[in-house]
Amino acid sequence: SGADTVGFDCSGLTRYAFAGVGVLLPRWSGDQYTAGRHVPPAQARRGDLLFWGPGGSQHEAIFLGNGRMIEAQQTGVPVKVSPVRLSGMTPFVTRVIET
């Protein structure tokens, strides 16, 4: 999992995106869930990490604002912009970069 010659899984996409601005995230989504400050989803800002599953272990995406997110659903499937899915989302989003 992560990034390979085929593409990204969800945690690989977030690691790649944040590395582009000099922030090194842990490899696994559950570890990324605890890598920043937790804020309620209603206070999400562009660039915050969204998570699904217990402790953020099942999936993650990057919040883009206006109810949209960018995600890699699995390796080999194109990265896409999607509406934010609230079902199964963790009670907090993770803010890694404070502005």
Question: What is each of the regions a protein language model found here?
Answer:
Residues 49-51:
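Hydrophobic beta-strand signal
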